[in-house]
Amino acid sequence: MGRIGVLTGNAGEIR
């Protein structure tokens, strides 16, 4: 799991 970013808006990107 990742954090909620602005690329996808879901917990998929690690920012």
UniProtKB/Swiss-Prot annotation:
The keyword Metal-binding applies. Its cofactor is heme b; Ca(2+). Its main location: secreted. It is found in: Secreted. The keyword rRNA processing does not apply. It catalyses: 2 a phenolic donor + H2O2 = 2 a phenolic radical donor + 2 H2O. Its EC number is 1.11.1.7. Keywords: Calcium, Heme, Hydrogen peroxide, Iron, Metal-binding, Oxidoreductase, Peroxidase, Secreted. One of its GO terms (biological process) is hydrogen peroxide catabolic process. Binds 1 heme b (iron(II)-protoporphyrin IX) group per subunit. Binds 2 calcium ions per subunit. It comes from the Eukaryota. One of its GO terms (cellular component) is extracellular region. GO terms for molecular function: lactoperoxidase activity; metal ion binding. Removal of H(2)O(2), oxidation of toxic reductants, biosynthesis and degradation of lignin, suberization, auxin catabolism, response to environmental stresses such as wounding, pathogen attack and oxidative stress. These functions might be dependent on each isozyme/isoform in each plant tissue. Belongs to the peroxidase family. Classical plant (class III) peroxidase subfamily. This is Peroxidase 3. It comes from Solanum lycopersicum (Tomato).
